Amino acid sequence: MFAAPPVIETRVFSRMPDRFRKPNKRSEWTDIMLLGGTADCFLEGPSFDAAGNLWLVDIPFGRIFHVSPDGEWTCAADYDGEPNGLKLHADGRIFIADHKQGILQLDLATGAVSPALDRPRLERFKGCNDLFFAADGTLYFTDQGQTGLHDASGRLYRLRTDSGLDRVLEGIPSPNGLVTNLDEKILYLAVTRDNAVWRVPMLPGGEATKVGVFVQMSGGLAGPDGMALDVAGNLAVAHAGLGTVWLFSPLGEPIARVRSCAGVMTTNVAYGGSDNKSLYITESESGSILVAEMPEPGRKMYG
């Protein structure tokens, strides 16, 4: 066990404007994920573009937003889907992990959303959750669906640059956020319902080996969700249901606790700002984007 780490406070960077909220509206997603409850939005998938705009998704209502550096919100797409994760490719294309429709791509010129990978080998995914680009353009993504300790059948995939698809891992109880370490030899995988972050060593050919637990977490109403790495190799882990983002060293030691100033549903994170030391956090209970100043800059992501 470790002593409690120092606390880093947050502030609200921006809140979804009321004109975009859908109060008391139900969807298929809210019926299952919120046990019949309602939500006027549920934010996830933060990712910055080259101009400093923060892109993010609204899962239950199939919307993609971008927020300017001064906090102005724009709805870039509204479609029949459940977008859960979002990442930018180096060429500026936007890829979406959609719980309902698979891996999608957003056309920035038209706002159209189209399939990039929806039925590999004629089979649907369980429900894609999050995604990550390696330096060479390889796309890793998680297929979570409704898996958990009762149904440990979630999967981790790799989409190679030659369009070949590999199943890297299966038998995972709720795979969620993912990111590699600095040299990309280790993949960190948030396993939400196990309340743990797994360490997945990757062989030169891309196969996983000797998978183990990197950090065993506790508490909260959900578990580890989105993650990001800084230039020192420290791992920021959004702990959904605890109102916290944990910062762990490359050895798994807790360095800091970033505390939400809003609700407890801290779902995902992205580094940004002029010096890339600002950690932006989607807080889905209040529909807000929080920000905290971190000790190290975030690693520049692919794209």
Where on the chain are the PLM-derived regions?
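Beta-rich, blade/repeat-based domains predominating
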Residues: 33-51, 79-102, 121-139, 146-147, ...
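Sequence/structural signature of beta-propeller modules
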Residues: 1-28, 291-303
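Short loop/turn segments that connect beta-strands within beta-propeller blades
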Residues: 67-72, 107-111, 159-163, 201-206, ...
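A short loop-to-beta-strand structural motif that recurs across blades of beta-propeller domains
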Residues: 63-65, 102-104, 155-157, 196-198, ...
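Short, solvent-exposed loop/turn segments at conserved positions within beta-propeller repeat blades
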Residues: 59-60, 99, 147-154, 192-195, ...
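Beta-strand-rich domains and repeat architectures in extracellular enzymes and scaffolds
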Residues: 12-63
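Beta-propeller fold detector
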Residues: 10-17, 74-78, 114-118, 166-170, ...
